[in-house]
Amino acid sequence: MAKEDIEEEREIRNDASENSSDEEGDDVLDSSEEDDDDDDEEAIKRVREGFIVDDDEDESQKRKRRKHKKRKREERTNDDENNALDQDDLELLMENSGARPQPSSNKLKRLKRAYTEDTEGAEEEEIGAKSGRGGLTDIFSDEDNNEEERADLGETRVDDDRNILDEFEDFIEEDEYSDEDEERQRKLTQQRERAQKKGPRLDTSKLSNVDRESLQQLFEVFGNGAEYEWALEAQEMEDEGNGENLEPTSLDEVFEHAELKERMLTEEDNLIRIVDIPERFQKYRANLNYIDLEGEELKSEQGWVANILFMEKQGSFSGFLEEPFKEAVSKVVEFISKDVYEVPFIWTHRRDFLLYSEEIKNEDGSVTNSVHKLLFEDDLWRIFQLDIEYHSLYEKRVNIEKLIESLNLDDDLVKDVKSLETMVAIQDLQDYINFTYSTEIRKLYDDKETEGIDANITKKHSKYAIFERIKSNVLYDAVNAFGISAKEFGENVQDQSSKKFEVPYRIHATDDHIESPEDLIERLCEDDEVLFKDPKNALNAVRKTFAEEIFHNPKIRHEVRTTFKDFASIRVAVTEKGKAIDNHSPYADIKYAINRSPADLVRNPDVLLRMLEAEAAGLVVVKVETKDYDSWFQCIFNCLKSDGSSEIFEKWNKEREFVLNMAFKRLTSMVSMNTKEDLRRECERLIASEVRRRFLARIDQAPFTPFGFDKGTKPNVLALSFGKGDFDSAVIGAFLRESGKVDEFFKSEDNPIRDRESEDKFSGQLKEFFDKNLRNQKPDVIVVSGYNAISKKLFDSVKSFVETNNVTANTEELTDVQNPPLIQVIWGQSETATLFQNSERARIEFSDKPTLAKYCVGLARYVQSPLLEYLSLGEGILSLTFFEHQKLISTDLVMEAIESAYVDIINMVGVEINEAIRDPYIAQLLPYVAGLGPRKASGLLRNINSKLGSTLANRSDLIENELSTANIFINCSSFLNIPYDEGLSMRDSSVELLDATRIHPEDYDLARKMAADALDLDEEDMAHVEEQGGIIYQLMQDGVNKVDDLNLTAYGKELESKFGKKKYATLQSIKEELVNNFEEIRRSFHILESHEVFHMLTGETTESFTRNTIVPVTVNKVGQNFRDFENSKIKFAKVTTSSFIQGNIEEASIPQGIDLAQGQVVQAVVLDAYYDSFTASFSLLEADIQKGAAPKFHKDPLKWNFEAEQADKQKEMAKERAQLAKTRNIQHPLFHNFSYKQAEEFLAPQAVGDCVLRPSSKGPNYLTVTWKVSNNLFQHLSIQENTQGMGKEYIVEHKKYADLDQLIFQHVQAIAKHVDEMCRHPKFREGTMSEVNEWLESYTKANPKNSAYVFCFDHKAPGWFLLLFKVNVNTPITTWHVKTECDGYRLKGFSYPSMLRLCNGFKQTFKSYVKGIADRSRSTKPAPVNNQAQASTYGGYGY
């Protein structure tokens, strides 16, 4: 689109923007979090807002428009003589002097919640300028108009009295009131009460970038409420008649603010709905004082964004494409920043600016047009992010410029502030100013000579007070004696660095002092006014002062930052705790990482994030250093030292080196942290991008396409599942029609995997279901899924049923289908169904159906619309994992990635707006349409319902009926689909056929012109055809394929040459839409591949379950030759993993002499995995297991610290040898000279309950028995050995045994038996405490009125269990500990011999526990608390 065209469009959309900033201030000083010194900005910001008046803006700033400003509009007064005073000060002076203050021009105060009668006496209400009947127009009108209108209403003076009183009544205490004061107080109180009844006014402090003329346009569109003036007056009279019986008149008085916020009904939410800026833009710019840049400032942003994106794409557009690439980026920046176009709009309707075409002449003389894609949707989102970043940087830089101007600085180091392009560079300059000119800044504040400086500035700069005193003291002569200033030193470093430190000369030479440092300090300390009389303290002060000057010098900082950026080296130092990291740890590959460059970490972003995660856990320390530091430091020092050779000169050089070391110690530490933080942000961004890419693949798929139909047609679906797949599990099914209606449910108690008879019965019942229930409407696809790998058997059974009974695809609506194929049986993606089955949505829709039936509905809905099913999860989608390293970034970043993917796909598909009005399930899509958001979407639906009778007939109605503002209409209109009835033979003139296409209304004339050219119509014919029903209608009647004959390239050239409009891609898009409107352009429905099904049902990936992976397996069957008892060998073994993967162990993979028994758990290594059949082959050979235990990652000799690894191994071995040397041997078959770790490794492949005896670290009179509680869970019990006469006794847990065999049988195995009983109890759940917590939370959310409790292993104390319970959904999870003993269980000091008794005892104990809390509450509170409901609720524990 040509520049003139864009400017014309912008003028039409916002003709009032030119004067938007005439009455606005610019002074908003930044608050950065880069460094401790960043608090300066926060302090400066607070002074600006309340104490000092802004100077007039310069002409360039007056032309800028403000967006999303977060501060109050600056006060303006009518009297020029009062301009020197702040408005608040003026009003305060006038109030104290008894004068009547002039009416406030536009003073706005923060809206506070109005309190009811009960709380009115406790807290003072603040209504301020927001009360009154004038409505929105009064708030935003100019001062003169405001005066007139309020005078007409007869309340100008009263309103201002109320403003002053509200603001200062708590600030000024008067000793006594006169009669007039009391009368005035009474009237003001009445006014406040009247204002409270009217409800709060609109808080315009949140309206950024909205000038008065723009607001006037908004009120013309939405009304100002003046037509209801009579009703408000009548209500007021009625309320006054009722006396004290006041009824609440605002939402704030009826609902809690939290509830209003949840429903998006707060004042801020309404402002977002009103402002003519896309809601997503408002959301991301909320913390910015967003400025509409123009001219050179806009070009600066465009260049900044283009350079960053060009570097990130690593030269993908080098050569002749570099310039077109940067031009495309610049254009997108303009679209986003100035035109407020959202990404989908730019991608769809400004695609010509994202392409570069060139004409290539062929050898035969013909010309080929080659098109290069410069930017993709991911790039547009990145530009959007960079726009936010730049404006944050720009805002901080402008604040620094204002501070420099206020201080009137003449300093070479601050002159180039406009060229600073990084946040750290701006922060470095601010630190320099704060340090160097701290005295001037304090004086500036004290004198109030300028505006925009923070009230807390003196407090902030007190840390520089000592340096200020030294600068003004005789002691500063010693700083000057270093012979070179920090500024000169910085210039030397900058010059030498630019020449790579290869030139011998320097810009500034270092002068040598005639006195030695010691003599000079002693002489200065003799001065009466010297700060430090002690020479040692004085020397330290001098050193620190010069070091601080070097530390704060921006040029020195720039050199350090540049060096770290180019030569940084990241390494890991293992802590004592981190030495426990083994080959199976997620941090194994970073344990001894060294010499990692920033480029290495950016290529593998998860590596740095795992490093930082391990650092946060105290396992490692991540160190960022620079390569060859000593050599680099020497080069820097050469810019500081003198060339003299005397003893005095050497002493001064030593002092200089000492000071430089002091400064560089802080500098490198600071820059190291900055570098680490910058790398972290970049790696998080890359992880988030990968999450977005993976999630896009999930939702970029059309519904499953029925046989014979076009892509995008929704199928009839039959979903089947038997859940866990136990033998007694029923098979449940749900049938969904293409409309989404759940038509039939199926249930068979005959599980087909039980036996052959059950399989036959199941097939017969399913056949009967097809013949009777599905006779009129056959499914187009059968989807099968479940909770685990056993579902593969059901899948095979259903597929066999289809083949055996020749169940063919649905062809009732098709013609000429001779041999229809069999109906397709596919695996269903279960992640959305798993969350749906326990959701509130499922409970409401199918309250009378079992959980598995809801699960089947979720499966079927996914097949009909993956996009809608993911969208329906809401924030629950965060529980799903789309990328293995997703957990390394915050949920906010994950949600942003997911939401951007939603926006892309939903706008690609479009939303049938009238369906969204009728169906909340479809309405979920609307907030993600370009320009809209949850608030604007809800407002749009509400306006359509109220103004148009629940149907939007045309896109143009959005503007004509004032349903949308201009910018929002431009962004969203083409993505709102309004289909027409293709069966009508007559043309309805009220229907715009192009509203059923992706063509934007701005291109409707272009589409009609193309249609006319395709029909060979001239202008007269066009007018006639328009009268007969329209050109588009005529094209559809004659055949849309006629547009295929148009020469779009020539047409595009004509548009560009004559009108300056780039429309090549737009023309092609219009042509496609005319031929096939809103065609399904998503990818086809993705049928899960074998490895995806394997991961879905087992939780294993192709990386976690592959060759040489060690896994525990349970022996199901052992094949052995029992005829030869002496030499019998195990021929084979059938095994199963915990995830129900079936496996075989052949004879060659079984060690000789091993004894295997059914039910035994052994450690095995995977030889081959067959993902499609959920089977694998395993080996038990020691050599294979050792191979599987080896590290799975490559150790680069240049990037792995082998020396440290070997040293740690040697220390560990020496420690173990020393431990073994202290131990003794006893004669017992279970005794082994093991350490605790060796004992655990030995027991790992053994059965649960097996144990070993081993030496104890307590001494020779002790032993330790280690027994296997569960997989990877072992309990170590200390045994005390006492000699009693001729025999011995063994004491464990205060129980005595005569020998070790008795101890093992009566104590260890008894405990193991109770552990096994616990694990078999239905209230027990496997998994970590966090996993069990998640299950308990989700269960109580699904059953909010039920109580629930559950047992799980205490992984921190093996042999103990955790009892977790929730009284109801609103109470926190409480955890009690249960100890397993040889004679039962112990809970809260009580013993229970069985699980039944334990559960009953827990319930009784809990009731006593609740009663005790209630009794204590009664004794401490004046009013009794009724806990009876809580106690009685915890009666049933079923789930």
UniProtKB/Swiss-Prot annotation:
Residues 62-73 have a biased composition (Basic residues). Residues 20-42, 77-92, 117-126, 140-150, 166-182 have a biased composition (Acidic residues). The keyword Iron does not apply. Keywords: Chromosome, Nucleus, SH2 domain, Transcription. Residues 1-206, 1417-1439 are annotated as: Disordered. GO terms for biological process: cellular response to stress; G1/S transition of mitotic cell cycle; negative regulation of transcription by RNA polymerase II; nucleosome assembly; poly(A)+ mRNA export from nucleus; positive regulation of transcription elongation by RNA polymerase II; regulation of mRNA 3'-end processing; transcription elongation-coupled chromatin remodeling. InterPro entries: HHH_9, RNaseH-like_sf, RuvA_2-like, SH2, SH2_dom_sf, Spt6-like_S1, Spt6_acidic_N_dom, Spt6_death-like. Residues 1-16, 151-165, 183-206 have a biased composition (Basic and acidic residues). It is found in: Nucleus; Chromosome. GO terms for cellular component: euchromatin; pericentric heterochromatin; transcription elongation factor complex. Residues 1229-1323 form the SH2 domain. SMART domains: SH2. Belongs to the SPT6 family. Histone H3-H4 chaperone that plays a role in maintenance of chromatin structure during RNA polymerase II transcription elongation thereby repressing transcription initiation from cryptic promoters. Mediates the reassembly of nucleosomes onto the promoters of at least a selected set of genes during repression; the nucleosome reassembly is essential for transcriptional repression. Essential for viability. This is Transcription elongation factor SPT6. The gene is SPT6.
